[in-house]
Structure formats: structure tokens, C-alpha cells
Amino acid sequence: MKKTSKKNNNFKIPGTELNSADAERGKEESQRNFVELLPLEVTYKIFSQLDIQSLCRASRTCTGWNCAIRNNDSLWKPHCLTIRAVCQREIDDDIKSGYTWRVILLRNYQKSKVKYEWLSGRYSNIRSPVNLPEKAMCPMDADTWGEILDAELEREVEKLQ
């Protein structure tokens, strides 16, 4: 008489447990991670539609997404060119220095926001440092302050006319 064995669906390896539920969960996780499933060109096209904050959040989602986003400089270039409208000199200097688009964005993003607020006159009528919002300051060189003061002067001249 032949011995028949029952098939064990819960095959155990020390430290791990593999069963049909684990396999199904792994399959679902893989299906949700489009970075691993789609061609890189398609993945980059999807990521290129994200704004700066969403792109940064996506890069923190998992290691695979972080690598895909961090290592593709073309995802960061359009955002750098957008802030270049406010920080042209700074962006151009960083390009000449050979920084990657991602590093250029990291170096200039906060400065561009602060500089834009100053240039647009948001802080024109501040009477005391206490009235400045927390993020109204960042290191700026003399040329940047010169641009801001020129913009203030132009606003004052317009008021007088």
C-alpha cells in the first residue's frame, strides 16, 4: 500500500511563514507598486505630473519610489525652471557650479518662496521684526537684498504718482 501525504499549505522556514495568504498579500503589494510593474518611461511620465510637494511625498513612500525619483534629474528640472523666475541669478550660478537639478531645487526652493514674498511687497509695511512671519527670512546675499529694495522703491514711486 502506498503512503499518501497531505499537502501542507503552511510550509515553514525558520523566521518566516509562507502560506497562500502571504503570497496573496505580496501579489497585492506588487500590484499597487506601479514603479516595479511599469516601464521606467511611463513611471517617470506619471511622476513628472506631480508638483514639488507631491514629488517629495512620493519619494518618501518607499525605497523603490525614492530611488526612481531621486535618480531622475529630469523630474526636478521643470520645478527649478519655475523658481528661476524669482531666483534667476542663484539658479544660474548653481547650474554653472555643476549641481544636479534636484540639489539646485533643494538649495533654492525656500529662498524662492521668501524672496517672492518680499519682492511682491508682502512685507512692505512691517513696522517691527515681531510682525514678520516665522518663515519670512532666509540667508540672502547683498544682490538679493538689492533686488528687494529696488522693488520697494518702485512701489513707493508708484504710490507717489
UniProtKB/Swiss-Prot annotation:
Domain F-box: 32-79
Listed PROSITE patterns: FBOX (PS50181)
Pfam families recorded: F-box-like (PF12937)
Gene3D superfamilies, alphabetized: 1.20.1280.50
Annotated segments matching region Disordered: 1-25
Protein name (Swiss-Prot/TrEMBL): F-box only protein 48
Species per Swiss-Prot/TrEMBL record: Mus musculus (Mouse)
